[in-house]
Amino acid sequence: MSAQADRVMDLSEWENRWQEGRTGFHRSDVHNLLKANVDKLICGRREVRFFFPLCGKAVDMKWLADMGHTVVGVEFSEKGIKEFSQEQNLEYNEEAVADIPGAKLFKSTDGKISIYQCDLYKFSSAVAGHFGGIWDRGALVAINPCDRQKYASLLVSLMSSDCRYLLDTLEYNPELYKGPPFFVSEDDIKTVFGGSCNIDLLQSVDGFEEKHRSWGLDSLTEKLYLLTTKTQ
């Protein structure tokens, strides 16, 4: 991480990406690693509450909701949230969030999907309780490297005792590309989550796409981990 340790993006930069349509991080289909490992995430449970950090307009939220689960996301960009509702043909209600000044809650009328529009670090279990599942795709790899411990502490605080947390990461040569998305190694994960969580590598795949050449890369590996609380 050393080559990227000082790289910092503020929320306005992310908002600008949404406003300018520079959302290459968005996938129009359900993530292949989620589909391949969803049974390990659900683990035979019904009506699981899932948390999506920095959810954007991930179609994975609707996919899990359609299975009978409920989803709570946090996203800073209101534009991203409204695009999600429009693209998924969801009617929603909008309300203020008492515990987070200035935040808004966008909740689908069927109650299956709730998205908080706010700074992730102002969110807490006091706002929305604990979760039995977390799908972290494009979140840990997007936050500033200097904030990883703060991020991990927040995510652990949201985990119920039986929570199953799928974490998607990217590995490449960080000397060649400054991010985001940032390089995250297994050692990085152990550093910030190892004290509280068991960490198991589920899958490692070649994630290189042609667009990555414009980043100056010629290889990229995508890895999926399962995190569970050490109390399990």
Curated annotation (Swiss-Prot):
It comes from the Eukaryota. GO terms for molecular function: thiopurine S-methyltransferase activity. Keywords: Cytoplasm, Methyltransferase, S-adenosyl-L-methionine, Transferase. GO terms for biological process: methylation. It is found in: Cytoplasm. S-adenosyl-L-methionine binds at residues 14-25, 54, 75, 137. GO terms for cellular component: cytoplasm. It catalyses: S-adenosyl-L-methionine + a thiopurine = S-adenosyl-L-homocysteine + a thiopurine S-methylether. It is an enzyme of class 2 (transferase). Its EC number is 2.1.1.67. Substrate binds at F25. The keyword S-adenosyl-L-methionine applies. Belongs to the class I-like SAM-binding methyltransferase superfamily. TPMT family. This is Probable thiopurine S-methyltransferase.
